[in-house]
Every structure is written in structure tokens, then in C-alpha cells.
Design a protein with these regions (language model features):
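Active-site- and interface-proximal helix/loop "cap" or "latch" segments in soluble metabolic
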Residues: 2-190, 240-344
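Long, positively charged binding patches that form subdomain-scale interaction surfaces
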Residues: 169-249
């Protein structure tokens, strides 16, 4: 497994959705989590001309201990989002989001993509604490009896959540026997922005030491005729910046597939594991083909409900859920009026 060395060129007649969520703790590793998130939709015309059809931003502060949302500022502004203040950015957050701003998911907005991805980004940000040594005095070190789950319980984890956390996988065995979560070290993160394409990604600020970045790219390719399949090409990466300014990959997947028809039914889907922390993790890629035959409009709900357990991966699931926006993006390819495009 190797990380992607760069980003592919933008095919003429395509639309590209990119997003990034940076998580940092400027007040120290035990301090609050500051989140900076950006997203953009970019259409590439047949002559190669690039045009921005939508942008969104958010800045948030999350309590470093309770994970409660302390502040949230978004562009575009949505007053209803004030009701999320005090909500734990974890289990239940997406359900609360759907209750307060249901239309954002319905229209596949960029802002919804960022908000929906906050729980995953906040969860993964804990890796920075581990790398920085901030968890060492919090982890119980006594080994548990063979076959016991006491060590896992003490660390607040439950086995069989995903392929990497399966009961007999490296992660859980180490927790049971050593009373500590093992630390994975990923490869250096190649720069994804090709020097010959300034439009390949939206602008992102420099990543601070001990910060993490979650970035996504979704390319929807032109169909060859009305109601024929749109190809999709997807990339996902979690990365960490260490104290010395070296960025490494924590998780990385690529996904390819096809979506066909007015309702956007999945006709092909395959995932590739590029970088994953444990040797058991790549087994989850086989779960991607479960989406074949599904309408993409149902993916966000269906994947969250049905794709659970040791044959799946939380991060791959979120990548597959984001395909729920494909039909909305595909409609922009045939829409010459930027004011009607879905990105804002």
C-alpha cells in the first residue's frame, strides 16, 4: 500500500468537489480542539476552463475533554446551526444535524458535507494526542488476563467496531494484553497539489504542528449520453503534522465507480486501500461493492445503518456516504447557470 503521489488532472466536462478539515490544539494537546474546514465545487468545461460553482467554510471550537461544540461560525451562515452549540461532536451529532437543518442534506450542500464530517475528524484528531505523548498517563498499563476485555473496557473501546478493531485483530489483542492502544506510524504524505494545476484543490492554510488534516476529493465525470453512467473518482486522506513539521498519512483510500440513470443508481463500485494503520484494515475494501444497485440518494442513511461490524471501516463508510451527493453534482454538469448549482 502506498499513498497517492499526486492528484489526477481534471477531465474536461467534469465537476470536482474538494473538502478539508483541519483540527488543531493551539492551547496545548490537552486544550480545546479548533477546527478549520473549507470546501469547494469546481466545474471544468470542455475547453478546460475552470469555474467555481460553490464554496463553504466553517470554524468551530470543541471542548477538549467533553467534545461538546463550544462555537460554530459558517459561510454561508445558517442561524439554525446555533442550536448545535453544546452538542457532543460524536455519536448522535449527525442525527441532531439532520433534525436542525434537513434541507442541507437534501440539496447536497458543501456546508452539509463539512458538518457531517466533523464527528469523524474530531475522532481521528485523537491520534495527535497519542503521537504527542498526551495519552501516556491516561492509559491503563496493566495487562489483562488472556481472553479478557477488561483492558479495552478501561480504554473506552469496544471490539468488532470495524476491521481494524476486530476482536482478534492487532489493535484489540494489544489492548487486552498490554492495556494500551498501539501507535501506528504512516508513511510521509506526498503533496497532492500538482504544480501545473493551481485549481486542483481549494486553498488551505499551512498545517500546524500536532494538527491533523482530513481531505476529500470527489470527481464526477461526464456521461457519454443522456441518462448514461457518470464515472466517479474519489480520494480520501487523513494526515498528521508532527512537532518537526513532517506530515505523514494515517488513513488513505481511493474509490472508483459509476452512477447511472435519473435517480443515480450505483452500477459499479470498488475501493482501494492506500494507507491504513493495521494489517487487518484492508479487508474492509470488499464492503464497497455492497453499494451496487443502490440509489445514491439513500447512501448516507443506508451505509450508516447497514454497514457495521468487523467487515467494514468507519473511514471508508464515510467516504462511501459522501457519494450521496453525486446526482446533485452531476446535475451541475448540464447546468450553465452557476446560480442554480448545488455547491453553496
Amino acid at each position: 500500500m502506498d499513498p497517492a503521489p499526486t492528484t489526477p488532472s481534471r477531465p474536461p466536462g467534469s465537476i470536482r468537489r474538494t473538502s478539508s478539515i483541519d483540527t488543531a490544539r493551539p492551547d496545548g494537546l490537552r486544550g480545546d480542539l479548533f477546527i478549520t474546514a473549507r470546501a469547494r465545487d469546481l466545474r471544468t468545461d470542455l475547453d478546460g476552463t475552470a469555474s467555481v460553482v460553490g464554496e463553504a467554510e466553517l470554524d468551530a471550537r470543541v471542548d477538549g475533554t467533553t467534545r461538546e461544540l463550544r462555537s460554530l461560525v459558517t459561510m454561508p451562515a445558517l442561524p439554525a446551526l446555533d442550536l448545535l452549540i453544546g452538542t457532543v461532536v460524536g455519536p448522535g451529532f449527525r442525527r441532531r444535524l439532520a433534525d436542525e437543518v434537513p434541507r442541507e442534506q437534501e440539496v447536497g450542500s458543501l456546508l452539509h458535507l463539512l458538518l457531517d464530517d466533523l464527528p469523524g475528524a474530531a475522532l481521528v484528531s485523537g491520534y495527535a494526542l497519542q503521537r504527542g505523548g498526551a495519552l501516556e498517563d491516561l492509559e491503563p498499563r496493566a495487562a489483562s488476563p488472556e481472553g479478557s476485555t477488561a483492558g479495552a473496557a478501561a480504554l473506552g473501546v469496544r471490539d468488532d467496531l470495524c476491521a481494524g478493531w476486530a476482536h482478534d485483530a492487532t489493535m484489540m489483542v494489544t489492548i487486552r494484553t498490554r492495556g494500551a492502544i498501539p501507535m501506528a506510524m504512516g508513511p510521509p504524505a506526498p503533496i497532492l497539489e500538482p504544480p501545473d494545476d493551481p485549481w486542483s484543490w481549494h486553498e488551505m492554510p499551512p498545517l500546524a504542528p500536532h494538527a491533523m488534516r482530513r481531505r476529500r476529493r470527489l470527481d464526477v465525470l461526464p456521461s457519454t449520453a443522456p441518462e448514461t453512467a457518470h464515472g466517479v473518482d474519489v480520494h480520501f486522506r487523513d494526515s498528521h503534522m508532527d512537532a518537526d513539521g513532517a506530515e505523514s498519512v494515517v488513513h488513505e483510500y481511493s474509490v472508483s465507480g459509476a452512477v447511472e440513470g435519473v435517480e443515480g443508481r450505483v452500477t459499479a463500485m470498488a475501493a482501494r486501500a492506500r494507507v491504513l494503520p493495521w494489517m487487518e484494515c484492508p479487508a474492509a475494501v470488499a464492503s464497497a461493492d455492497r453499494l451496487i444497485g443502490m440509489p445514491v440518494g439513500e447512501l448516507r442513511t443506508w451505509v450508516r445503518r447497514e454497514m457495521t461490524g468487523a467487515s467494514t471501516c468507519t473511514h471508508l463508510n464515510d467516504t462511501l456516504r459522501a457519494l450521496g451527493d453525486v446526482t446533485v453534482l452531476a446535475s451541475a454538469l448540464d447546468n450553465t447557470d452557476a446560480g442554480d448549482t448545488p455547491g453553496v
